[in-house]
Amino acid sequence: MKKAITLGVSIFLFCACVTSNVVKTDKSAIKKEVNTLLVNWHKAASDANFKEYFRVLDSTTVYIGTAAEEIWTKEQFANFSKPYFDKGKAWSFTTLERNIYMSESAKIVWFDELIDTWMGTCRGSGVLEKKEDSWKIKQYVLSVVIPNDDIQAVIDIKKKNDAIFLKRY
């Protein structure tokens, strides 16, 4: 009987030790890592560092700009952007605030940010995926922020261009 009890206790303790060794996801460390990546990504544009800027974009990245027709693959966005980087001045986005969220698996992260740009205050949002040991930006969306009280004036300005764009559909 003592052997059965000892065996039972041993199995219980072994199982308890095995389950306590499970690595828990440190969400605050992941958020810090992603935040640093995004800060450095925006800095790479400010520094006109083409290689570093595009290094963190996944091969399947989609970059969505402020104009209706601006939906670019990584390659298309790189081709559009290269002349700006080559001149030594791409763009400068300064983060005002950023919120970072993540999936339960902590392999997918999404964020929103308010940024100060040459267009004034804008909103960026995006999705990152953990691939092997590094994060890759899968999608980034840049939107111009318009106060609700000013939206009618913007709608009036956009009508002509929207009509031209909508003829495609």
PLM features: what roles do these ranges have?
Residues 1-25:
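Bacterial Sec-dependent N-terminal signal peptides
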Residues 62-72, 84-90:
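A short gly/proline-enriched turn/hairpin at secondary-structure junctions
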Residues 63-65, 110-111, 137-139:
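Short hydrophobic/aromatic-rich beta-strand segments that constitute the beta-sheet cores
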Residues 17-55, 149-151, 155-169:
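Short, low-complexity N-terminal intrinsically disordered segments enriched in polar/charged residues
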Residues 121-152:
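Short beta-strand edge/turn micro-motifs at domain boundaries
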Residues 68-71, 115-118, 142-147:
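Solvent-exposed loop/turn segments at secondary-structure junctions
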Residues 78-121:
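Surface-exposed, charged secondary-structure patches
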